[in-house]
Amino acid sequence: MSAQLQHVSVLLTEAVDALAIKPEGIYVDGTFGRGGHSRAVLARLGAGGRLIAFDRDPAAIAAGQAIADPRLELVHAPFSEFAVVLDRLGVSAVDGVLLDLGVSSPQLDDASRGMSFRFDAPLDMRMDTSRGRTVAEWLAEASVAEITEVIRDYGEERFAYAIAKAIAAARTGGAIATTGQLAAIVEKAVRTREPGQHPATRSFQALRIFINQELEELTTVLPDCVARLSEGGRLVVISFHSLEDRIVKRFLRDEARPPQLPSRLPVRAADLPPPRLQLVGKAQRPGEAEVAANPRARSAVMRVAERCGVAA
């Protein structure tokens, strides 16, 4: 891997520690990336352990082929297919799941992926380049209302409507085909600037999240993870922006909350099912040293939960 396309795993030791790995256990890395977390998990597994690693990016799967370890099973699929893949592999329960969300450094730093406004490249943004629409294809057909909704909801951008109108006006003169074109359009439409942040940051984030259905993927996989965890198994999730973390925080909180007693019904608390999860510690963020060494770690938040008793 070239130096430019290296990926530094965030909260590496903390995340693997949080999995509380059993040497002969079965674990899932939902986002293989360049294998930083997976390698650390493999280092703690015994000869009978097993790691199933997902990634929807063909480049990540190709990079993973360099790991010659029979305990590792690489799966080219989004983690929303977690349950289907485990069924296919004959795995009914796992001892831990790690989800390192968001976009990887190689995806951002490879100009050909079209995810960053730092390069003028084809406007793609797909994590899985083998299927689905590119951002350029979607922008060519989307209405002003649809573009506004995506940029507002997924980018939390207050100038979403102005940006959407500018995109619609610009495409009348020809397709918006490159990241440079889009960044210039957004830059002109944003009337005020946030210190230290490019005007197109929120819009690019929004379009990437939307085109890859990142939040829908997350909402799908979380309950599937809990359903497959064995008793005492850990779910470890690292989020990188508030939209992701909000979903994770709410899900874990709800799963760890005891069920409410129905009002006016003769039901005892002992008759209700226990919560499926128990929260483990508080949300954890990278320390100053890690952020200094890897500035992209600054927004990371790690949350951990453990599976409570599983009914026979």
Swiss-Prot record:
The species this protein was found in: Azoarcus sp. (strain BH72)
Main location group: cytoplasm
InterPro entries to which the protein is assigned, alphabetical: RsmH (IPR002903), SAM-dep_MeTrfase_MraW_recog (IPR023397), SAM-dependent_MTases_sf (IPR029063)
Organism lineage string: Bacteria, Pseudomonadati, Pseudomonadota, Betaproteobacteria, Rhodocyclales
Record has Signal as a keyword: no
The protein's name: Ribosomal RNA small subunit methyltransferase H
Top EC class, one word: transferase
GO terms for MF: rRNA (cytosine-N4-)-methyltransferase activity
One of the GO biological process terms: rRNA base methylation
Catalytic activity: cytidine(1402) in 16S rRNA + S-adenosyl-L-methionine = N(4)-methylcytidine(1402) in 16S rRNA + S-adenosyl-L-homocysteine + H(+)
Family classification: Belongs to the methyltransferase superfamily. RsmH family.
Function: Specifically methylates the N4 position of cytidine in position 1402 (C1402) of 16S rRNA.
Binding site for S-adenosyl-L-methionine: 35-37, 55, 79, 100, 107
Subcellular location: Cytoplasm
Alphabetic keyword roster: Cytoplasm, Methyltransferase, rRNA processing, S-adenosyl-L-methionine, Transferase
Key word S-adenosyl-L-methionine present: yes
Record-listed E.C. numbers: 2.1.1.199
Record-level GO cellular component terms: cytoplasm
